[in-house]
A protein has these predicted regions:
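Vicinal oxygen chelate
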Residues: 1-7, 26-79, 87-115, 126-140
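Catalytic core of Fe(II)/2-oxoglutarate
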Residues: 11
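Active-site-proximal beta-strands of protease catalytic cores
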Residues: 123
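Conserved active-site tyrosine of GNAT-family acetyltransferases
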Residues: 18-23, 90, 119
Length: 140
């Protein structure tokens, strides 16, 4: 049934600024952008990482009714090779700490999370299993 995520969407009140911020963070420009009915940018999408996962930035005016305006809920953790360095970079770019750097057991898992300047929770994680799967797929 569930085979992997297709797109993660982050809502933003300032899509132009969010697109610039994520382009700087990721070191790439969005590969796809779409205007809304009024001609203003409504959606920008990046492909990132080893599996080219999609991160979509969406103008909040298109959010479903009842979408939370405050950070919280599910945290998607993106694998990083150095949680401390990634965490410091995010904070230096204006993100705010949501979850401090936290070792998870004794198997090498480490997580942290921030709230981006647009109100979205962004998790980062060093995950040995991610690297094992990457290695076994021949992508390492």
């Amino acid at each position: 049934m569930l085979r992997g995520f297709a797109t993660i969407n982050y809502w933003t009140d300032d899509l132009e600024a969010a697109t610039r911020w994520y382009a700087e963070l990721l070191g790439i420009q969005p590969y796809f952008q779409r205007p809304g009915p009024d001609g203003r940018l409504a959606y920008a999408e990046f492909r990132i990482g080893d599996y080219q996962h999609e991160l979509g930035l969406v103008d909040r005016r298109f959010a479903p009714e009842g979408t939370a305006a405050e950070p919280g809920g599910v945290i998607t953790y993106w694998h990083v090779d150095d949680v401390s360095a990634a965490f410091e970079r995010l904070l230096s770019m204006g993100a705010k700490q949501y979850q401090p750097i936290t070792p998870r057991g004794d198997q090498g898992f480490v997580t942290a999370a921030v709230v981006d300047p647009f109100g979205n929770v962004l998790g980062i994680m060093y995950n040995p299993h991610y690297l094992e799967i990457l290695q076994s797929s021949g992508r390492a």
